[in-house]
From Swiss-Prot:
Keyword line: Capsid protein, Clathrin-mediated endocytosis of virus by host, Host-virus interaction, Inner capsid protein, Viral attachment to host cell, Viral penetration into host cytoplasm, Virion, Virus endocytosis by host, Virus entry into host cell
Family: Belongs to the orbivirus VP2 family.
GO (cellular component) term, any one: viral inner capsid
GO molecular function annotation: structural molecule activity
Subcellular location(s) of the protein: Virion
Gene source species: Bluetongue virus 11 (isolate USA) (BTV 11)
GO BP term (any one): clathrin-dependent endocytosis of virus by host cell
Function of the protein: The VP2 protein is one of the two proteins (with VP5) which constitute the virus particle outer capsid. It is the major target of the host immunogenic response. Responsible for viral attachment to target host cell, probably by binding to sialic acid. This attachment induces virion internalization predominantly through clathrin-dependent endocytosis.
Protein's recorded name: Outer capsid protein VP2
Amino acid sequence: MEEFVIPVFSETEIPYSLLSHYPLAVRTNVKIANVDEGHDVVKIPESDMIDVPRVSIVEALAAKPTRNDGIVVPRLLDITLRAYDDRKAMKSARGVEFMTNAKWMKWAIDDRMDIQPLKVAIDDHNAVNHQLFNCIVKARPANADTVYYSYFPLRDKVKKCNHTNLDLLRGLTTTEMFHMLQGAAYCLKSSYELITNSERNNTEETYAPGVHNRIRLVRGTRIGYKGEAYSRFVSSLVQVRIQGQTPPEIVDDIARLNEIRTEWINAQFDSTKIRALELCKILSAIGRKMLNTHEEPKDEMDLSTRFQFKLDDKFKKTDSEHINIFNVGAPATHEGRFYALIAIAATDTQRGRVWRTNPYPCLRGALIAAECQLGDVYHTLRQVYKWSLRQDYGRTEVPLENNKYVFSRINLFDSNLEVGDQVVHWKYEIDGPAETTYDNGYICKTEREDGELVCKISEEKYKTMLDRMIQGGWDQERFKLYSVLTDPNLLTIDFEKDAYLNIRSEFVLPSYFDQWIYSPMFNARLRITHGEIGTRKSADPWNKRVVFGYVKASTESPEYALGQYFDTRIQLYGDALSLKQSQSAVFQHQSQQEDFPVLTSYAKGDVVCPHSGGALYTFRKVALMLMANYERLSPDLHEGMEDHTYTHPSIGGANQKRILEMRDFSQLICFIIDYIFERHDQLRDMREARRILYLVQSLGEPQRLDVLSVASPNFSRYFLKLKDVQRISDLNVINFLPLLFLIQDNISYWHRQWAVPMILYDDTIKLIPVEVGAYANRFGIKSFFNFTRFHPGDAKKRQKADDTHKEFGLISFNYYANTKIAQGGVHTPVVTTKLDTLKIHLSSLCAGLADSVVYTLPVAHPKKCIVLIIVGDDKLEPHVRSEQVVSKYYFSRKHVSGVVSICIGQNDQLKVYSSGIVRHRICEKFILRYKCKVVLVKMPGYVFGNDELMTKLLNV
């Protein structure tokens, strides 16, 4: 057949039963009404489209699709056609057979990050219905496997949008590169009520037992977040007693727990009244609402199950600790015993003290719920209920039961603290650039100022680790950087645990409070001090909350290595689904930067698009920063230029042209290797670069080395040199290796606290452990960028390697040749389905959304090819939409021989465009007393067919 008929009909004018024999039909009498001439995307969840939830964009990007009827990979046909083209002839017993590169095809499919969870309806005529805003596209089941949605956020003329390559925006969000950061802060726990008991004139005095001394405050005054009472308390001039109270956020949850408690007490403590699963769900809800850092959700299923068993045990009357808790007299109460048993169960599950920073919601929620009743939980357990931590949980935590911990970490992006409220917060300053020479390089030097504390590597502790390293090789699970640092140790100090009321009810601040801590290896100076809330919470996260605090944009974040001293938040806010909403002010801030016009198509201060302004600027700026560091790490010498000076770090423009051409982080990684080691000033294709990284990360040693030797032979030779290091310059290659293993937008680390080896160019060269995902979930380049800043000068590079240096090389080679650190389990339903979510959200920040579905019509004769039939709205001209869709067929563009693009408006206006081997006519069709329009698609000389094209291609 040379003709293909597409009915365009209204069911009010003709029943579909008369048209159901057509492979494709368009029903126009079911629409979602426009709002202000734009699509009402808020209606997507209740429509048969794709599964995008009606939640905030932050929640939507972490959401797992729940209501869908299967998935579709938009570029699946493109991939399978390429695999078909690349088949190789193989001899077999049956003669010559053609074999497909199944491994490549599987990788290409798995590498797609634009999977669509479909919500479709199958009608009474077995047609699969794909709903659009202006119509419903009905496809026969035999042809439905190639149908997918194509969403496109429209260009805002004022913002000069360029919405091509939105994969880059998605990749930045996945690798935490599109996130701003704000300093960490602490405030008095909202689950505590601090009530004044006595006062003193100065900290030299002691509080006499039973004496209620009054100086400035009335006994019984509540300590709030500001005012004289707060000031005197944090100055350790007020003695307080603590009682629990319920924060507003969890009033309903605590009420439900108290109902269960009352039922349990009234039933004479019958354990059957305690339903562990229900308790665990309520406690998890509390833990999630009272989260003090914004981080990746933890999978708590296994731990939750253990917790439920512990709850069952503790509420049994025969349990020894249950008996002991009930044998304790006043001031113990039955109401308190309920929460005491919950806290003990949580502690046994954790096998240690539970803190507010616990990553598991159910345990964190158990602690907070108990605080609302008991005040300081572990102090009350010991003093009132005569229960103490078990010795086998660690002796160091038992003495802490004498203290009461009154401060908790807060997330300033989410905190509801009011202007004027007092907090304790961290200041975080980065070392600026310095001038040096090629002969000296840029090494990690300790140059502290007067009065500064210093955090650096302890030579004694490091020697112990080095001995273990030489004897047993690299231990990625047990080598920790914090274990070799001096005090105050920036990787372990925690104000929430270090500030407390001691046994004499005196408020104690840590020795490092209000002092600068300098750490040259982190290029940072930090200081924790008192502060004041200067602005109210706002929906836009670009909001510096503390008067002398800090907030940094995505382009600045890689330099901030110590993740526990700040919180991060994606530079998008508002609803995932909205007709029109405001974008973050961070993009206006970025547009004011001096290099913004150079790296984007905007003038300084322009109103910018979050993608073509924010995402492109972020990627390009970070790429230049990374390139600048790695150029200095080149193992090559600078003959004749040893005395030349340069400023480091500084961003040059030598590679700017190539970086402006990049579309993906994998291209940047390959370019760094190619430019520095291969002397190639050229850019690899994005698919080739992604494939290389995938193979390096996933293959074992022999194949991994083969891939490197083919892709980058000079780099491979330097890598192999690590087995026999001769000069210091041979070690430089080690710090390039994290690039290959720790960055990709669709990987997950095997464990987020494993450590990879990197060289620290200190006064003495050290091989140090860099944890890939610890400290507030750093990811990708943030985990190691800081250490790429240091590099040896030519004088150091020329030096012969000693035995320790040779060990560094061999240890690093053995680790990186075999590591599987990038092969953790990816949460595929979440990671792979977010491109359309971002497109729809971006449409609300720009000029709205255009939607369409794409249907593939196979052609069987005289040559095998495909024709694309696109049905969409009238927000785009049909020929423009045609070009957009065809451009996605990267591998198999030669097989797309024709396109039919049908546009339908809200008033049923019909426009059609055709190109290639196809022609079209719009005709009237009459059946009995009914009529409709049809798009008659003609292919002179060609015969369409092959309904099972996709099935065949996936099984070649």
